């Protein structure tokens, strides 16, 4: 006679409870648990400084407790974006560190982006091993919210530095990163911090079909990252003949916390960074937060100015109004991510406004 399914289920539950008890005795309480004992809450994030990119990431910013890679060509805005993340974390009272492996951090530029350099922890390591050890100590302290490593290509192994100029060191940097990331991944999660690696692009030799571009440091970083951002300069912003900034596009090529492959476009202005005011004007007009009639913009029946630059100047002089408009935009975009019942047409309009 077959056993009662209910009795069989109870026996299996008892066996599982016994196994959990043994695991807790061996490794300590909390080593294993049912998910209902530790319910998953909304992902904690830090803003990137760009409304469009925060929306493209799907959770309102970069997720805490994760490793992030920002890569792209030279002068595309990689370090600028990372410094904006630091500035946003500091606004929330967070502590941040910058591992300047390239020895090229412009402190004055960082201040212009809103970074409090007096409270920024900075290190300029001599070798890749030293850099990863410093990162490990900072992560394990659980005191730092954001750590930026600039850049992966500059994490030179000690053997390469101590060797002669013509020596071959095949795969040495890739092995260094692979070993370091194995140790750092769980520590970053437990510390609930964001570890950002800035990376450069190289060209594969002999590639005829497909994309010849690749990033430095091997494949380990691609696997261990939860978010990978491909940042590109797609145009120039001109004022008559002089260039004032760059039109920038960021593609989320990997995302473990939301749907990937979304894109965000925004302006990076020289000596200013990401033009949040420009985003407020463009996205606000598309979402209907700002009223646009020809070249004139209005908000709550108040005319803001004629032309985009004049409206920017108005927002600079009236920061409370700018913050109010930004809050309404973020509220609309936040609802679009979290609302299951939103009509498909409304969701599409919001995505068109941002992406």
From Swiss-Prot:
InterPro entries: AAA+_ATPase, DNA_recomb/repair_RecA, DNA_recomb/repair_RecA_CS, P-loop_NTPase, RecA-like_C, RecA-like_N, RecA_ATP-bd, RecA_C_sf. CDD domains: RecA. Its main location: cytoplasm. GO terms for biological process: DNA recombination; DNA repair; SOS response. It is found in: Cytoplasm. GO terms for cellular component: cytosol. Keywords: ATP-binding, Cytoplasm, DNA damage, DNA recombination, DNA repair, DNA-binding, Nucleotide-binding, SOS response. PROSITE patterns: RECA_1, RECA_2, RECA_3. SMART domains: AAA. It holds the Pfam family RecA_C. GO terms for molecular function: ATP binding; ATP hydrolysis activity; ATP-dependent DNA damage sensor activity; damaged DNA binding; single-stranded DNA binding. NCBIfam families: tigrfam_recA (TIGR02012). PANTHER family: MITOCHONDRIAL DNA REPAIR PROTEIN RECA HOMOLOG-RELATED, RECA. Belongs to the RecA family. HAMAP family: RecA. Can catalyze the hydrolysis of ATP in the presence of single-stranded DNA, the ATP-dependent uptake of single-stranded DNA by duplex DNA, and the ATP-dependent hybridization of homologous single-stranded DNAs. It interacts with LexA causing its activation and leading to its autocatalytic cleavage. This is Protein RecA. It comes from Wolbachia sp. subsp. Brugia malayi (strain TRS).
